[in-house]
């Protein structure tokens, strides 16, 4: 290898050991995209729309978690089970949306339990 290449390689190595690694930003975007392709295979999504969807998923997640936590606390329980999650969903989501969410959730839990 030439001197320049060796210098570059050395620099790259140095920056890694210094801890200049890019911070990972977690998001639901790959899952949102997979669901989009299931319901509308020929539809795309802009990065701004994806960001909004990601915020929406995070918001709903936090609301359900907080409500489930409250329910567990009211009933002097220290564990959040699928029952608390289901009740939280019923309390947070309106009518038909809650029914569909509960049935999808039940389906997912059943699938997970049977695969174990």
UniProtKB/Swiss-Prot annotation:
Modified residues (N6-acetyllysine): 4, 11, 14
Record's keyword terms, sorted: Acetylation, Antibiotic, Antimicrobial, Chromosome, DNA-binding, Glycoprotein, Isopeptide bond, Nucleosome core, Nucleus, Ubl conjugation
One record GO biological process: defense response to bacterium
GO cellular component term of the entry, any: nucleus
Sugar-bearing residue positions: 103
Tree of life domain: Eukaryota
InterPro entries assigned: Histone-fold (IPR009072), Histone_H2A/H2B/H3 (IPR007125), Histone_H2B (IPR000558), HISTONE_H2B_site (IPR055333)
Classification via PROSITE patterns: HISTONE_H2B
Compositionally skewed regions (Basic residues) per UniProt: 1-11
Subcellular location, record wording: Nucleus; Chromosome
SMART domains: H2B
Purpose: Core component of nucleosome. Nucleosomes wrap and compact DNA into chromatin, limiting DNA accessibility to the cellular machineries which require DNA as a template. Histones thereby play a central role in transcription regulation, DNA repair, DNA replication and chromosomal stability. DNA accessibility is regulated via a complex set of post-translational modifications of histones, also called histone code, and nucleosome remodeling. A mixture of histones H2B and H4 has antimicrobial activity against the Gram-positive bacterium M.luteus.
Record note on quaternary structure: The nucleosome is a histone octamer containing two molecules each of H2A, H2B, H3 and H4 assembled in one H3-H4 heterotetramer and two H2A-H2B heterodimers. The octamer wraps approximately 147 bp of DNA.
Name of the protein described by the UniProt record: Histone H2B
Species whose genome carries this gene: Penaeus vannamei
């Amino acid at each position: 290898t030439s001197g320049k290449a060796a210098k570059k390689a050395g620099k790259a190595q140095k920056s890694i050991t210094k801890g200049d690694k890019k911070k990972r930003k977690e998001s639901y975007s790959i899952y949102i995209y997979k669901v989009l392709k299931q319901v509308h295979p020929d539809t795309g999504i802009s990065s701004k729309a994806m960001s909004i969807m990601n915020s929406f998923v995070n918001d709903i997640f936090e609301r359900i978690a907080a409500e489930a936590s409250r329910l567990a606390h009211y009933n002097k329980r220290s564990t959040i089970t699928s029952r608390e999650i289901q009740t939280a969903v019923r309390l947070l989501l309106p009518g038909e949306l809650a029914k569909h969410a509960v049935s999808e959730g039940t389906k997912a839990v059943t699938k997970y339990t049977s695969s174990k």
